[in-house]
Amino acid sequence: MGLKAYLEKIEPNFEAGGKYEKWYALYEAAATIFYTPGKVNKAGTHVRDSIDLKRIMIMVWAATFPAMFYGMYNIGQQAHNVILNGGASLPDMWQAALFTALGGQIGLESTGGLAMFLYGACFFLPIYAVTFIVGGFWEVLFASVRKHEVNEGFFVTSVLFALTLPATIPLWQVALGITFGVVIAKEVFGGTGRNFLNPALSGRAFLYFAYPAQISGDAIWTAADGFSGATWLSQAAAGNVTDWSLNADWWDAFFGNIQGSVGEVSSLAILLGGLFIIYMRIASWRIVLGVLLGGAVFSTLLNVIGSDTNAMFAMPWYWHVVTGGFAFGMFFMATDPVSASFTNSAKWAYGFLIGLMCVLIRVLNPAFPEGMMLAILFANLWAPLFDYFVAQSNIKRRMARVG
């Protein structure tokens, strides 16, 4: 018996009145991974396409793989470099013990890229697993109570949330963060398609304000004991970067040879995934370009104004793009179709506001050198208003046209 025939055979058990009716959400989620839903519209449709929401979400999920895989390698690379140079050692964490038990060695001249990748995987995969299991539990619970299908948007929420975290974050905080993002930022408003804030960023913001010591500072970015190292943005905010024309350092930041959150370090890897979802018309190029323009215009304005007391005024726009969460937020967070603006004209304003606010927070807020997370959440609140103004403008123009 084939898989499709087997699923069709057991389906009546999960439908209304069936033996396992309360588990319908789980059955539907599993079945539609392999096959499109069997339901049809009662009336004619405007667009007919074989793709559905699950396939769209899976494509976005797959688009994060370049940043994810490089991020795991970079975790190992950063730890290897500081241990090899002396003054640091393997951390007293079960992830490092697992790596050693698997036969891995790091911090040696003979250490290769595969060992670095394995070391990073020992840290990131548990984070992603906890995110998926805990967040998936809440998704299934709400779907079962409301008697509807499991929303596929969690495929994307889970991986985006995990990629914005440092490798050394405690797993119980990961569970709390994704719980806040799924339950408070999404499900209480009705679930996928009804939330007005980005769930992944809402969960990260909760962790930032509730447990700042484990998600910010200098000691969390490298998975090694006895080493503290600031991110590029933190160094710039402290006035430790005086020559922004260092091309070699910029390329290091672009390729991802720097410290940072797992999925935010390599602008090149992010660019590959971002261009894919733009090509597939899943992400809006207007929002991406708007974010880039907003950041470039405002940072250039601050460069012209200058400051004798704040070194961040001199930071060029092309450095803003490759440091912190700017690139990752621009491609994967700002383009969330639910919490972003919907109309084309509003997308430009929405994106521009994000880029402007990110640079504004980075430069003028000394307590928070990273600004993309707060900029996107702030713009989420403005997105409906931008759409409203565009809709009203279109209505007035059409009314004037018809007299």
UniProtKB/Swiss-Prot annotation:
Catalytic activity, as annotated: a ubiquinone + n Na(+)(in) + NADH + H(+) = a ubiquinol + n Na(+)(out) + NAD(+)
In the bilayer, the protein is annotated as: Multi-pass membrane protein
Question: Which BP terms from GO are recorded?
Answer: respiratory electron transport chain; sodium ion transport; transmembrane transport
Obligatory cofactor(s): FMN
InterPro entries membership: NqrB, NqrB/RnfD
Q: Does the keyword DNA repair apply?
A: no
> Where primarily located?
membrane
The record's GO CC annotations read: plasma membrane
The UniProt keywords, alphabetically, are: Cell inner membrane, Cell membrane, Flavoprotein, FMN, Ion transport, Membrane, NAD, Phosphoprotein, Sodium, Sodium transport, Translocase, Transmembrane, Transmembrane helix, Transport, Ubiquinone
Segments traversing the membrane: 56-76, 114-134, 165-185, 260-280, 287-307, 312-332, 348-368, 371-391
> Which Gene Ontology MF annotations are present?
FMN binding; oxidoreductase activity, acting on NAD(P)H, quinone or similar compound as acceptor
Entry EC no(s): 7.2.1.1
Q: Name its cellular compartments.
A: Cell inner membrane
- Major enzyme class: translocase
Q: Which residues carry this modification: FMN phosphoryl threonine?
A: 231
Q: Does the keyword Translocase apply?
A: yes
Pfam families to which the protein is assigned, alphabetical: NQR2_RnfD_RnfE
Instruction: Report which superkingdom the organism of origin falls in.
Output: Bacteria
Q: Which HAMAP family match?
A: NqrB
Q: What family is reported? A: Belongs to the NqrB/RnfD family.
**NCBIfam families, from UniProt?**
nqrB, PRK05349.1
| Free-text function comment from the UniProt entry | NQR complex catalyzes the reduction of ubiquinone-1 to ubiquinol by two successive reactions, coupled with the transport of Na(+) ions from the cytoplasm to the periplasm. NqrA to NqrE are probably involved in the second step, the conversion of ubisemiquinone to ubiquinol.
Q: How does it assemble?
A: Composed of six subunits; NqrA, NqrB, NqrC, NqrD, NqrE and NqrF.
User: This chain belongs to which protein, by name?
Assistant: Na(+)-translocating NADH-quinone reductase subunit B
Q: Taxonomy-wise, where does this protein's organism fall, top ranks first?
A: Bacteria, Pseudomonadati, Pseudomonadota, Gammaproteobacteria, Alteromonadales
Q: Which gene encodes it?
A: nqrB
